[in-house]
Amino acid sequence: MAKIMIDAGHYGNRYNAGVISGYYESNMTWELQGYLKKELEEYGFEVGTTRAAKAEDLEVSQRGLRSLGYDLFISLHSNAASAEAPDYVALFHLVKDDTTKADEVSKMLAKKLAPVIAKTMGTVQEPKVLDRPVDFDRDGD
């Protein structure tokens, strides 16, 4: 069975969306991580998390390195909004200098997940699947 690493976005009480008083992205992603981990484990997946404690502050590169040996890395976030209702879902997949099969699979997975998440959240607009250019020195430059 596949191994999945979940990253609960930010840490502590960080990133208030501004629209809803008392809402912090870090709290939401930490709670969602717990639900998602439990659900995936019930389906038989081996699931790890990048942080053992909500207040643990790790650099992005450290969180990414903790996913070595896993088949899928999911980083949870919720962007600020200008209204109380969710506007749209955005899923990002990585695009590297030397695209591999894994990059294409991540894009396909994002395209399949986006409409399901949007329907569940009841968003106003269609979901967006976006490229996130990254060069973690896979090509050696």
Where do the model's predicted regions map?
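Active-site-proximal helix/loop segments of hydrolytic enzymes
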Residues: A2-I4, S26-D141
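Short glycine-rich His-centered loop
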Residues: A2-G22
